[in-house]
Amino acid sequence: MSYNILRHRDHPGGLTDPGLLATIREDLARDGWTLLRGFQPDMEAFSGVVTTLCRRVTFDPARSHTTDTTQMVDAGLGPIGLHIENGNTPRCPDIVTFFAQTAAFEGSQTTICDGRAVWDRFDDALKVRWSQRMTVERVLPEALWKRYLANEHPAISDPAQVTMEHVLQFKAAIPDQDFALHPDGSLTYRLTLDPVRPSALGGETRGFANAVLGPSHNYQPPRYAMADGTEVTPEEIERIRALAEEVTHEINWQDGDIAILDNTRVMHGRRAIADANRNLFIGMGTI
């Protein structure tokens, strides 16, 4: 994986420089990620990057908003395993962007890992197993699933507007998902997906890009089951985690950095936070 840094001195027009967007897309197509450094953006400028790259913006319903298109990242202080953002939702973002408004003095490096490199490290048995489809199942509290649906359904914008008709419409619009509603308003959600996939940005090369190795911050831990009926075990996850660590790299943040990732190819995580004086924001969506 190349360590791509696009610097302001090479793009004097700043974040709206005509050549910058083309270079970002070249880096994403080649390496799956890039880093913008020295542009000194504010939150409005970061939001502009998100809307330029993403035709449609999406959110994590458990996070607080900072603008109409961005949210604050707040996931405790411990390390976070590799994952794609919103990887267990029916509309997985194609692009995820991070803005280090204030970088930590120590620790808190964002880890990045090309799913194609992980897939290349799988032996034949692992490749056969993970070429199957996988079902994710978890229980979502009423507040979270209604916030998600209010953002994703085109006819509503407020969780208070959600009705069962909207739920059924969303289910019909996106295949491979099912649910069971409970008396307390919570919902058992099931999504069947491909844990190994080609990038949404183009090309046929597949990569291990999913949320199996990742956290469940703000959510109930999911249950993962393969198409053959077997569950994904903790031992299996740790084996893959070790393989992925061999090809994992770190972003050592500087104030004002913006990282842009192909969320259908490159997984990300975080080292433990040693300096809590940091502010990181996220924006994501579909191309």
Regions found by a protein language model. Name each.
Residues 1-13, 66, 76-82, 91-287:
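Active-site environment of non-heme Fe oxygenases that use a 2-His-1-carboxylate facial triad
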